Amino acid sequence: IAEQNMFGMAAGLALSGLTPFVSTMAAFTTMRAAEQVRTDICYQNLDVKIIATHGGVSFGQAGTTHHCTEDIAIQRSLANMTLIVPADGWETANAVRAAVRWPGPVYIRLGRGFEPTHYESDDYGFEIGKAVTISEGTDITIIACGIAVYHAAEAAKLLRDQDGVSVRVLDVHTIKP
């Protein structure tokens, strides 16, 4: 396990003009290699794209050493870091394509890969920094990101069908900027 070295090498590749994509578990990206991500990549605003898997408690039975509930807060605090939390595989594909074109470091937080699919394709107007309106409503608004988007949409359907509540659901996939 050498996540620190991986991020140091990614910084070197970015300094040579390449756009490296690196991937490891969120706990190791955010905790084990925090200094390298912050100092080597973010401070220099390098074009490194980080794919962090197993965010939150998605690793289930692996326990607290592999859970990472603080990664969004930590990555959001880093200078120059763009932070995206896709809802599903379709949105992940859009996030990766957008990250390629986006200058500077990007952190894309994923679950374990068993998340339910919300979107039916990748053709819905994904744009870094702009929320996606899942449903329009006038009574309440639910704001969600990541796996919570699916659950927010399901809750909105229940509220509409059972109680007649008009619910707007927003997929705020970009946490920063």
Where are these regions (language model features)?
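Conserved thiamine diphosphate
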Residues: 2-5, 12-141, 150, 167
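Short, well-ordered alpha-helices that flank and scaffold nucleotide-derived cofactor binding pockets
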Residues: 11, 39, 157, 161
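Short helix-loop-beta junction
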Residues: 151-170
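Short beta->alpha junction loops
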Residues: 1, 170-177
